[in-house]
Amino acid sequence: MQAVQRHILLVARHGLDGVHLTDGARSLRAARRDLGADAIVGAFCGTTRHEGISAAEAGADYVAFGPCGETALGDGRQAADDLFAWWSEMIEVPVIAEGALDPARVAALAASTDFFAFGAEVWSAPDPLAALRRLVAAIG
């Protein structure tokens, strides 16, 4: 999948598959209207069920929760394991774990998470390929 974060206008211009919105459900309906039914429109929903449910009801193809570990980003709250477990049990929309992931968190979330979004965990590592391999191995 090729997607861009927030920049809806770039999706069609560059032939991308979709967009990853960072404001939960707030701009989801407009993105769906502008990009059409075939585009992948996902939403980052922070750490709350409410935000995720709102995005799913607005037509998100997936929701992402995070951060999943200690990070300087955000307000210090973390997406808890039980959020992912509840979501995977109750909601059909795929769920992504995002932000501050390490092999232990990945292993703990693997059974209840559809996908993982790795970023700084890989790109900030001294050996990005080795870091990615450790994270992928933790999925099981």
Question: Language-model segments: which ranges?
Answer:
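Alpha-helix-loop-beta-strand connector modules within alpha/beta enzyme cores
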Residues: 1-4, 23-47, 76-102, 135-140
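Catalytic cores of alpha/beta
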Residues: 2, 6-17, 47-61, 90-97, ...
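A short, well-structured catalytic beta-strand-centered motif of the EAL phosphodiesterase domain
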Residues: 20
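Glycine-rich phosphate-binding active-site loops on the catalytic face of alpha/beta enzymes
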Residues: 23-31, 61-76, 110-138
